[in-house]
Amino acid sequence: MSKFPVPLRTIGGLRPSTTAAISAANIGFTQSSRALSTGAAAKSSGLVGQVARQYPNAAAFSIKQVRLYSSGNLPKHNRVALPALSPTMELGTVVSWQKKEGDQLSEGDLLCEIETDKATMGFETPEEGYLAKILIQEGSKDVPIGKLLCIIVDNEADVAAFKDFKDDGASSGGSAPAAEKAPEPAKPAASSQPSPPAQMYQAPSVPKSAPIPHSSSGRVSASPFAKKLAAENGLDLSGVSGSGPGGRILASDLSQAPAKGATSTTTQAVSGQDYTDIPLSNMRKTIAKRLTESKSTIPHYYLTSEIQLDTLLQVREKLNGLLAKGTSGQATKISINDFIIKASALACQRVPEANSYWMDSFIRENHHVDVSVAVSTPAGLITPIIFNAHAKGLATIASEIVELAQRAREGKLQPHEFQGGTFTVSNLGMFGSVSDFTAIINPPQSCILAIGGASDKLVPDEAEGYKKIKTMKVTLSCDHRTVDGAVGAVWLRHFKEFLEKPHTMLL
């Protein structure tokens, strides 16, 4: 039974998995012998279109069904590849297998848990059968999309035939980078014995030779994919013996590559130094990559405003009192953050430039306001979305954000719940130690609002000479390509008015 008890939902007539196995498409699994009906194919096409519309900057999605047949003495079988469980996923880590070799599988069973660039999600069994062979073991990191995960067969009697099965590199219907293709082997000399007939979807068999050292010229021969991985991870290929044709370095050879500037032998830490090296999760790598790209490619500028909260706090107290009476104290209390989300959405309706996407060759103004709310989790930052926040009441926003934040910390969010927002709110004021800060824009969005903490301030008063008020500083980060300075100032003026005069949110 799945360990993610999330209610099933229907999208475009298809049943997405409880654990997001299909919601972000590009699934590299094979189809069972049951033929797809015209209606099912149409539904699949509809789902792909819906996902593409929701994630305009994501790579093209596809749901591929490929039947892979037997080779040699192996019976017919299905190859299940690592799927893309989020639009931005490139690599994955197999956290755990929920089934073991020989287990019977029913369509929809939780097959394994995969750590993506966003969260740890479950991958459901694509079809009925028996798990004949697991190719990627638990704990395997940075597995590329399309890499062969496991083998499924229709009959239990066929499981034993795959005991010694190894991945031959044949296509498994995924979308892994096409970089590790070995060159076509030379045509063998004529032989008196006829060669066996080629099998459908069977890759040519290339004898695996012992690693060949590099030539004395110093030139390193490596596949494009291996070079890409080495560059991203700072690995030195000069001392690696390749196992590919002619000594070419493949991605599988990188485990022996030392970091650039490091020696191949393990060195002891200098006496007196005490530290722990923490491996990077896929989520942390993605956060680092995306925020670095955002800060280095988006022309940020910042607008700060101080907002008086006294009237809002009075309205909040009255509304929470009414909610408590009407629901016997069961309703979620409205927080200042809920007012902020609502006011942000309404201000985006007044100033649509702030609710737009930068699409490189054009600007897309979104007609709905989906507010992403930054939530800190043990694994890193994630941004669940309040969809159509401009059209929702404060009580609805309050209950949704509490539920989404809880599931975010438990790692139970599905991709469509945290990808595709149009505006982001990041609130560090609740920690009580932050007066103001600036936040980094989440592309392709144009703005992010940073919320500081509330503090007391003395201001002049005609009656008593001075009075104490409660204020809060907010800073709007804007993309100057889509939001000019004056436009950002107008947005901030509307936002300030909504919070200082909360009744205007009802107009």
Swiss-Prot record:
UniProt domain Lipoyl-binding: residue ranges: 77-153
Cofactors named for this entry: (R)-lipoate
Keyword tags: Acyltransferase, Lipoyl, Mitochondrion, Repeat, Transferase, Transit peptide
Single GO cellular component term: mitochondrial matrix
GO biological processes: pyruvate decarboxylation to acetyl-CoA
InterPro entries according to UniProt: 2-oxoA_DH_lipoyl-BS, 2-oxoacid_DH_actylTfrase, Biotin_lipoyl, CAT-like_dom_sf, E2/Pdx1, E3-bd_dom_sf, LAT1, PSBD
Top-level EC class as recorded in UniProt: transferase
Compartments it resides in: Mitochondrion matrix
Cofactor details (free text): Binds 1 lipoyl cofactor covalently.
Region (Disordered): 168-223, 248-270
Every Peripheral subunit-binding (PSBD) domain range: 221-258
Purpose: The pyruvate dehydrogenase complex catalyzes the overall conversion of pyruvate to acetyl-CoA and CO(2). It contains multiple copies of three enzymatic components: pyruvate dehydrogenase (E1), dihydrolipoamide acetyltransferase (E2) and lipoamide dehydrogenase (E3).
Family: Belongs to the 2-oxoacid dehydrogenase family.
Name of the molecule in the record: Dihydrolipoyllysine-residue acetyltransferase component of pyruvate dehydrogenase complex, mitochondrial
Organism: Caenorhabditis elegans
